[in-house]
């Protein structure tokens, strides 16, 4: 599936790149940090005991991301958690290219404003290498999910991976793309 018009990628090329070159003194466009991928992870603890749960959430994650998720499995057995090696524990999707830009656009402009008492995302959630992690409390805030079809509310993690070397560069990149950080 190809996308002819990707508004966030256009904004990146026309506004973000010149602004970042000016602010950080890059000599070449290719030095400017860019988005590499977005990983959406859904940890389903009860997935090891209930296979239907994995299937239901896989359909929801596929609707949200527009791409089939991969089932994540336990790497080793842990007796205290009643987990054996190879049991399904969650789902993940890796978005790149146009799908990644469209998901980020939807996240910034539609999903985050729907959160209750939303005053901006935490500016301290960077990992030290220019990647940003964000937790979402439920799947209902996405427009693709019908509230009456949801059997169980499930949160998810969204990790935005950039080519930025520092958190400062990554924060500026995401802010210029429209990410609403807390003041």
UniProtKB/Swiss-Prot annotation:
UniProt xrefs under SUPFAM superfamilies: RL5-like
Keyword RNA-binding: yes
GO CC terms of this entry: ribonucleoprotein complex; ribosome
InterPro entries given in the database record: Ribosomal_uL5, Ribosomal_uL5_bac-type, Ribosomal_uL5_C, Ribosomal_uL5_CS, Ribosomal_uL5_dom_sf, Ribosomal_uL5_N
Gene Ontology MF terms: rRNA binding; structural constituent of ribosome; tRNA binding
UniProtKB keywords: Ribonucleoprotein, Ribosomal protein, RNA-binding, rRNA-binding, tRNA-binding
Keyword Chaperone: no
Gene Ontology BP annotations: translation
Pfam families: Ribosomal_L5, Ribosomal_L5_C
Primary role: This is one of the proteins that bind and probably mediate the attachment of the 5S RNA into the large ribosomal subunit, where it forms part of the central protuberance. In the 70S ribosome it contacts protein S13 of the 30S subunit (bridge B1b), connecting the 2 subunits; this bridge is implicated in subunit movement. Contacts the P site tRNA; the 5S rRNA and some of its associated proteins might help stabilize positioning of ribosome-bound tRNAs.
Family (UniProt): Belongs to the universal ribosomal protein uL5 family.
HAMAP family xrefs: Ribosomal_uL5_B
PANTHER family given in the database record: 60S RIBOSOMAL PROTEIN L11-RELATED
Subunit composition and interactions: Part of the 50S ribosomal subunit; part of the 5S rRNA/L5/L18/L25 subcomplex. Contacts the 5S rRNA and the P site tRNA. Forms a bridge to the 30S subunit in the 70S ribosome.
Protein name (record): Large ribosomal subunit protein uL5
Organism name: Kosmotoga olearia (strain ATCC BAA-1733 / DSM 21960 / TBF 19.5.1)
